[in-house]
């Protein structure tokens, strides 16, 4: 078998087509109902085996550091704990805006995990990657799977749905970064009037949806984010 020295992968963004917050769990997280949709916007990740035997990281942005707050680094550490892999150099070209809700960091983590599996020929399935990747972030499992998924639990419980859409997504990202922890901390009033999950999925029939038939899908975070960041 030919051993790989380098892999280059696209790390795709996502949009949430509606997001309902249901309740706060005893572990401090929130149960949600949402639809994750993978989109073409992507970062680029190149993983190269390193002769130095250590992990190295580089990027076109300065705000990403070589520490565990960087989800590329966290993903490498997660895989290394299981397989004791050698060192690599991870280069990340960022195109997805941070704090935009497009899942850039989680996507990067999932892509690094899949890239490490490929370059080191690791015998680990997507399902197994999904299970361990939730330790990094609640929506990382979605990026292991991709396509279109109903997300429940904290976002890690995924159900594939058929999704037919004609047209394009228009992604507008103002110069604002929304911290996820802050957004969840402001959400108590929304939870008091949260719509049950059964209502959220009333527009589905047989887990098949056509976006052209949907007039509007609400995102509960809008009620706390828009007043603070009207732009």
Residues covered by each model-derived region:
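ATP-binding N-lobe of GHMP and related small-molecule kinases
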Residues: 2-100, 118-127, 163-164, 173-176
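Short, basic/glycine-rich phosphate-binding loops at helix/coil junctions
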Residues: 51-65, 112, 134, 209-219
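Short, charged, solvent-exposed linker or helix-capping segments at domain edges/interfaces
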Residues: 56-57, 102, 180-185
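Short glycine- and Lys/Arg-enriched binding-loop motifs that mark or flank ligand-binding interfaces
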Residues: 14, 24, 95-101, 111, ...
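Conserved, helical-rich catalytic subdomain that frames metal- and/or nucleotide-binding sites
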Residues: 145, 150-231
């Amino acid at each position: 078998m030919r051993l790989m020295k380098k892999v280059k992968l696209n790390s795709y963004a996502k949009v949430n087509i509606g997001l309902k917050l249901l309740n706060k769990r005893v572990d401090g997280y929130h149960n949600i109902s949402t639809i994750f949709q993978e989109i073409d916007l992507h970062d680029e990740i190149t993983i190269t085996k390193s002769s130095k035997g250590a992990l190295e990281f580089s990027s076109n942005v300065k705000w990403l550091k070589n520490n565990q707050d960087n989800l590329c680094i966290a993903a490498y550490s997660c895989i290394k704990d299981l397989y004791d892999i050698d060192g690599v150099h991870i280069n990340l070209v960022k195109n997805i805006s941070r704090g935009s809700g497009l899942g850039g960091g989680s996507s990067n983590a999932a892509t690094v995990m899949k890239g490490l599996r490929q370059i080191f020929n690791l015998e680990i399935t997507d399902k197994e990657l999904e299970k361990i990747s939730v330790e990094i972030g609640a929506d990382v499992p979605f990026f292991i799977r991709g396509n279109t998924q109903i997300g429940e639990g904290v976002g890690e419980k995924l159900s594939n749905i058929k999704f037919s859409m004609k047209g394009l997504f228009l992604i507008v990202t103002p110069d604002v970064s929304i911290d996820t922890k802050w957004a969840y901390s402001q959400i108590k009033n929304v939870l008091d009037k949260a719509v049950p999950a059964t209502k959220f999925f009333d527009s589905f029939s047989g887990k098949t949806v056509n976006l052209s038939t949907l007039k509007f899908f609400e995102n509960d975070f809008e009620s706390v984010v828009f007043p603070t960041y009207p732009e």
